[in-house]
Amino acid sequence: MFKKFSDNIYIQPADGYTDRPNVGYIKGEKYALLFESGNSQANANLLRDDLEKQGLKQPDIVAIFHWHWDHSFGLHAWNVPTIAGRKTNEKLREVRLWEWDDASMAKRVETKEDIVFCNEMIKREYPDRSQIKVVPADIEFTDTIKIDLGA
């Protein structure tokens, strides 16, 4: 469940079992922004359900902080505009081409493209790794972006 931080800011704490990230929710007068997409379709579904249970509107926009799997692998699950920085999107375009079989994952650890911890958590979050879907964000920015959610 999301914890109320202020009248307009809510935080869902991380879940270390499968490395689900802290997720922020900002409620503007007109729009709501979810900060971090979750690490899977299942994580995104849980976030959606928790927002509904708490009477919070579904996000109009989803933004991610960086490309790491726990922050970005749920991006495809949101049917709203998504936002990421240029370097993050470049990396997501690269990662979406990765294979997720054991050998490919082990090879990325050897080449230091990834780490054992992430592989273990990905395998735990995705019993069926064919379900991994990596996408870049719809909106890409360089340096800064201003989003008016309505006061």
Predicted segments with their positions:
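Active-site metal-binding motif and surrounding structural segment of the metallo-beta-lactamase
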Residues: 42-87
